[in-house]
């Protein structure tokens, strides 16, 4: 880490880490290096770059000064050694899988996963000889029993998308590290490093869809991996350079760093509004249950209090009346937008059974915790009174 900034607080690092305006012609905002390639002063220097003996940049698919600043800043926020930036969260996840897994290896994943990650596992690496095992990671005995000689990776989200199930990061990491060469990879998109830092709890690799809260404005797609230097080097040179080519543009890296500067402020607002909405939903007669880590009624409330700074801006709840109720509620919303994704200023709502998981059979949805009346809210930054009023009028229209 940069000695000048490493001991500052979270928001100070998010704004300043790794950059000195006086070393950049006084430019307060880091310059954007919009170039695909870089000139070498000598042939010998170029040879050193290709051999990894020189630290200079030579092609943006591998490195770029704008991306390098973003990567170092994200590593500082996650308290990791190094970061690698990608053009999407799925690019980050795919590069991590393709780099660290080989045919014949096993990966153990939580039963509930983001739909595109599920597809990558079963229609991507699963078709190239990697064995995928699904377990309920809230059951540590089930997890431990699933680990075998070929297991190379444990992967999960916490909270899980979309049902908000938590996984005990420290406990899973402790189990994993009793086995040699077993890597724990965590998708930290829902929390960001402001709310949760998995590397500090024993995880080996953190992945993000930086499209979401890190960016915060729903105007780019991006992904980031943070891990130790040796793994980051492999993921960059194999997963990014050779296997996926999922390169983040310098302009989008600039926008992402701009969003990260206000991350703490935004997350505080997302969390405070979500807490109020979750309580309102819990008290509503049309709601069967609410899954929100900030509610004392949440089954994993104690775990949330241990490993998360705040409970986050995502809420899952079940409407009485199943599929029909869920669709009526969704169609009646006026301020919440019916859309996938999360983490922007705008509040979003989605009905997984009708939207993201509509291609699953009823049995498949039940297996993965996707019930018919499940609604997921991504609480934005609007005035809380307006959000509450929109939910209330949609409930009345649904009835």
Swiss-Prot record:
Substrate binds at residues 114, 376. Pyridoxal 5'-phosphate binds at residues 59-61, 89-90, 209-211. The keyword Lyase applies. It is an enzyme of class 4 (lyase). GO terms for cellular component: cytoplasm. The modification N6-(pyridoxal phosphate)lysine is found at residue 212. Its EC number is 4.4.1.11. It comes from the Bacteria. Keywords: Lyase, Pyridoxal phosphate. Belongs to the trans-sulfuration enzymes family. L-methionine gamma-lyase subfamily. NCBIfam families: met_gam_lyase, PRK07503.1. This is L-methionine gamma-lyase. It comes from Pseudomonas deceptionensis. The gene is megL.
